[in-house]
Amino acid sequence: FGMHASFTLSDRSLEKCMNASKELDCGYHIHVAEGLADEEKCIEEHHIRVVERLKKFNILGEKTIAVHCIHADDNERDIILETGTTVVHNPESNMGNAVGVSPAINLIAKGITVGLGTDGYTSDMFESMKVANIIHKHHLKDPSIAWGEVPMMLFENNRKIAEKHFNGTFGIIEEGAVGDVIVVDYNPLTPMNGSNYNSHILFGMMGKSVDTTIVNGKVLVKDGKLLNINEDEILAKS
């Protein structure tokens, strides 16, 4: 179920979603404590915090993606961990909406699975990786932060999240895994090896560097061009 956020959902709506989910055996995607207004309205109208309200309606769990969680307090973070709920961090969206900085580093240290996303603010995951790396260093005033956590979010945790919701092995090149691959046109100015490739991705690559995209074994983009649709026709219609 794709839901917006606690502050736009009535108890009746949450109850209907909860009951329907039982029949469909599915999870939820919902924005959680993105801005202070979400928490403030929940406390004012329901006398509990956002994560507590979602737990009350059995919205949280292994199949649920809680987006943002910027203003979730310590108790709410404990609930997220206990229920196995996944969190997705969207740094550029948070900056653009001026809602604060995600406690993603803390959530990861706590044992919560945190993925990296965009919330529609961009479609360039290389860019999201760069911003995530910088924003936590700045916010926590620690230049050593995020070197490991951000690649973990993008390359390990996003894969885990995909495997929770879709059948198959994702985000890794091995026999039996889903054949999703991108080829990047990148000529490194300094040596690139197994110990520094994350830095090359972070500082040298960008979305427009993608030359080829293969999805489930099918080539959809080659030489930077979409193969299966007419871009000019779609642009003219739109």
Description of each model-found segment:
Residues 72, 93, 135, 187, ...:
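Short, solvent-exposed coil/turn elements at secondary-structure transition points
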Residues 56-63, 105-188, 205:
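His/Asp/Glu-enriched, well-ordered alpha-helical/loop segment
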Residues 1-123, 142-145:
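Active-site core of metal-dependent hydrolases
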